Design a protein with these regions (language model features):
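Extracytosolic ligand-binding ectodomains
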Residues: 1-174
Length: 174
């Protein structure tokens, strides 16, 4: 996986040398604004990516988040904005439910808790404490000299986590 300036260098050299011509490319994270913005008009088209298409998510939850974010910061959110927001909202919900800072009470409060998010409700599984926050999957494209995601769909994390029996095999009880 390549990040920011390394990704820009790879894309620039790959485009120059025809590395991506007639080749399917899958690139995790590249659809996030944090990665598309530095690519600008060099964004390769048609890559299959995960990311955050903040400009095309049309749900009441995301609309409320987007409006509040833009009003406060006069900018658009990045995926890091969502992750940070969800981390704090989840911690606050767990603390409120536990009504304590005792570690065992916090663990018990976190197990199975549901929390609203800009992507819809998420929860933390009781069996392994994994969040069900999902990911947007789509393709890269150019619009007005900038990289964007198109043909996106949100994939719920709960649909891709291992079933309880598999978790039990992987994490035997002590």
């Amino acid at each position: 996986m390549l990040f920011r300036s390394d990704l820009v260098k790879l894309v620039r050299e790959g485009n120059t040398r025809g590395l991506f011509k007639d080749r399917a490319v899958v690139s995790f994270l590249t659809g996030e604004p944090e990665y598309l913005d530095p690519l600008k008009d060099e964004t390769p088209e048609g890559w299959i990516v995960t990311g955050y298409p903040w400009y095309s998510i049309k749900t009441p939850e995301h609309d409320a988040f987007l409006k509040a974010y833009q009003a406060k910061y006069n900018d658009y959110p990045r995926l890091g904005s969502i992750v940070g927001y969800e981390t704090i909202k989840s911690a606050a919900a767990i603390l409120a439910k536990a009504n304590s800072t005792d570690p065992e009470k916090l663990i018990a409060a976190a197990e199975g808790i549901a929390v609203p998010s800009p992507f819809g409700e998420i929860s933390f599984r009781k069996i392994d404490h994994q969040s069900t926050l999902g990911a947007f999957v789509g393709k890269t494209a150019l619009k007005d000299g900038k990289g964007i995601m198109v043909d996106t769909s949100y994939r719920k994390g709960s649909d891709y986590l291992p079933i309880d029996a598999e978790v039990e095999k992987l994490r035997p009880k002590e």
